[in-house]
Amino acid sequence: MILNTFNLQGKVALITGCDTGLGQGMAVGLAEAGCDIVGVNIVEPKETIEKVTAVGRRFLSLTADMSDISGHAALVEKAVAEFGKVDILVNNAGIIRREDAIEFSEKNWDDVMNLNIKSVFFMSQTVARQFIKQGHGGKIINIASMLSFQGGIRVPSYTASKSAVMGITRLLANEWAKHNINVNAIAPGYMATNNTQQLRADQDRSKEILDRIPAGRWGLPQDLQGPAVFLASSASDYVNGYTIAVDGGWLAR
């Protein structure tokens, strides 16, 4: 039965940045599909833990700054110590800094690049080594952006980092397919999250954005649940190196 290919019963998903918003939505969606969750955050994700355990799945909460790559191996070791394996990695942790390019600071550049792309690569590397050790392959889901496809304004390091996410997704897929590792990405459109709070608070800018989205609304965390489950499951075994836009039709305009 086709629905069985989406069943994640017995799988373990490691998700970075799942205390709120899109990360929380994906964590809950994966849990509902059968995954136990390892959540890596800088704060205790109390609400996410409640939602995951409410559907009968286990949740291991780990605290770390993902931009410090020296701690990545320990995170995977703790996940394996608790659950015996890792099957899925979702690289969701990320930040954005807004400032005109002409004034953009080195700190705002480095902070964003270190978390949004450097940590994505090195966490993927660490988890891929575990996948290879386990001998059964695995699934890596990176979180890209509309600004993986477009330039945007006033977010130079974010645009650069998310363009890089789409590129590194392709490279890792090319190199690791031989190990039965699928590396894909999801590019959310304009979503109602903390990252877009300033945009949504600006009535003129919000209207301008909504007027371009064929769906006529801001995206919600649950809009990423289906794509995340698909990319984490055997239903996507022949999908590799691809970035799926979940944008209400934004890129079609």
From Swiss-Prot:
Pathway assigned in UniProt: Glycan metabolism; pectin degradation; 2-dehydro-3-deoxy-D-gluconate from pectin: step 5/5
Binding residues for NAD(+): 14-38
Binding site for substrate: S145
GO molecular function, one term: 2-dehydro-3-deoxy-D-gluconate 5-dehydrogenase activity
EC number from the UniProt entry: 1.1.1.127
Annotated catalytic residues: Y158
GO terms, biological process: pectin catabolic process
Record InterPro entries: 2-deoxy-D-gluc_3_DH, NAD(P)-bd_dom_sf, Sc_DH/Rdtase_CS, SDR_fam
A Pfam family recorded for this sequence: adh_short
UniProt catalytic activity: 2-dehydro-3-deoxy-D-gluconate + NAD(+) = 3-deoxy-D-glycero-2,5-hexodiulosonate + NADH + H(+)
Broadest EC class assigned to this enzyme: oxidoreductase
Gene3D superfamilies with a match to the protein in the record: NAD(P)-binding Rossmann-like Domain
UniProt entry keywords in alphabetical sequence: NAD, Oxidoreductase
Family to which the UniProt record says this protein belongs: Belongs to the short-chain dehydrogenases/reductases (SDR) family.
Role, per record: Catalyzes the reduction of 2,5-diketo-3-deoxygluconate (DKII or 4,6-dihydroxy-2,5-dioxohexanoate) into 2-keto-3-deoxygluconate (KDG or 2-dehydro-3-deoxygluconate) with a concomitant oxidation of NADH.
Cited NCBIfam families: kduD, PRK08993.1
PANTHER family from the UniProt entry: 2-DEHYDRO-3-DEOXY-D-GLUCONATE 5-DEHYDROGENASE, SHORT-CHAIN DEHYDROGENASES/REDUCTASES FAMILY MEMBER
Full protein name: 2-dehydro-3-deoxy-D-gluconate 5-dehydrogenase
